[in-house]
């Protein structure tokens, strides 16, 4: 009798679990299955895009290629800020690099600088909830932290709309924008796994309305003040907890040590010799609501590439396209003689969904006319950049996949500058020298004599399972 009762309880629990799972899945699929088309408004705005103009008040810029430099330049901006710091990031962890950024922000807040931090509401639920390091920052009187679209299982129709932006603004004059999240994979040189990515540092000492730093600041204010952004533990009494006090002390000590080791570079506020002049920098962004989005960034980047004179080179960690996206590439290939893309090989891809979809659809991608180079560097490549002719460079957070096109907020900078274009080309070539060109039929052109990463049996099984069990949901990954 007792055994029968236990079985009945277990069946009820299982039934409840299956009902909840079905509710979540149905809510997500119904909300995000339909993919909006490009509006006439977007087409008109793209035709008259700001990247076609030249700015009278030019901004200076430089690309940040290496992870240690990316950490140092962030700390440098924070340390020298006098009034306000804005940090927006998809993911923020309290590992070594994350603690250094937290320590730098806490130090700035102690100096009276106003800090506003915006983090995606799904990633923050995993990394920030119950974490004394983040409570130590959120409880500071000069700090505000908000979460974009907090995870809410009761509203699955909002679940997949994530904030994928990554940027840091100091005093409304200088900023870093790119594809790096705020933890060890992307910042510093700490033991363990790494991802290779790319940022741009932009400097404008006397910004005017037309400048990209003001475009970015206005974008931030819009997303900060809209209904989907809510506060993260802003109770100042949290600072009295012993665990929080200990965490703050650890942050202060760790940051002070890093600062002393890099004091000369961090305190240098003259960026002239390390940056390049630009003719124009323009910000391209997706809609910021949590539903299925109009593919604004995809369309605008596509139109830019179609107008190239002779060269388009794309770097992306993942390729997951629908027919509309494939058609865009076919049009580019018809117009541009040198059209190529570099992405992670199936074995080198850190994202199992990206690896599985690429393995299945590689021939379809090749049929568009684009040349594919597969990166075999050992660590997953995460850079999201486009090189157009010898004067345009595009860098930011946008992956060449349906998630970036239709689901996430995304930012890309379009930079008109031959110097930046040359710097980007050199950075791209570093990775391309560890890649092979895949040809139709599965053979390779291997001019750099690259040793490919082994595709293990375990990874093959994982890819097989993803393709056959989750392939129907590829628009969500």
Predicted regions and their residues:
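Charged, low-complexity intrinsically disordered terminal segments
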Residues: 2-143, 153-164, 170, 174-477
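Phosphate-binding P-loop/Walker A region and its immediate neighborhood
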Residues: 146
